[in-house]
Amino acid sequence: GLMAVKEIRFQELTSSPNLFKQIHDEMNVMEMLRHPNIVEYYGIEVHREKVYIFEEYCQGGSLTQLLEHGRIEDEIVLQVYALQMLDGLMYLHSQGVVHRDIKPDNILLDHMGVIKFVDFGAAKVLSRRSISTNASRRSSSFLQPGAVNAQGQSLQGTPMYMAPEVVKGETQGRENAMDIWSLGCVILECAKGTRPWHNLDNEWAIMFHIGMAKQTPALPDE
């Protein structure tokens, strides 16, 4: 079968020291996971100038690409996707893993249309041997290093999918809740065809509405 291959040059690793730790931590997380709704990790090969990471290939692309054609109008399809996302998330949390950057970019579809969570670059393992990273490699809208919440802690996640607990710095003991909020935002986007908080023009306005004004994204009229 086909495999997806990520290629990383050693030059990139040496110029960005955090990247090596980030990749190492992500591989540790992915090695733990085996579930129909999680992209499967096959292994890594280290060559002279490059590192190759092998993962399950998802022919259907991302949920983002699907939503470029508009909302998911068929309610049965939406229900199936929502149940698959919930199954995948329930499994992650049962393994003590919090994804921390759930959004349509990080949800893929295989050739059968089965939902798969991907990109564990921001994931955290809730255990004594905690591993965490600061950013998702593929997230252009991910907060830049240095962004902080109301408690002065580093923020992780993409603002429009970010839970109130994250903005207010109240995630201690409620880590799973942030993924559930983000997943709710994704399902809402599938139903509406527009991103949560799409009417706001910048990330700080979004975070104010989520954390300070205690507002939720608008629900569909129908």
Could you describe each region identified by the protein language model?
Residues 49-62, 66:
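Conserved short submotifs of the Hanks-type protein kinase catalytic core
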Residues 81-82:
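Activation segment signature within eukaryotic-like protein kinase domains
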Residues 147, 166-177:
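Conserved end of the kinase activation segment
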Residues 43-44:
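A short, aromatic-enriched beta-strand patch in the conserved N-lobe beta-sheet
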Residues 1-12:
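Glycine-rich ATP phosphate-binding loop
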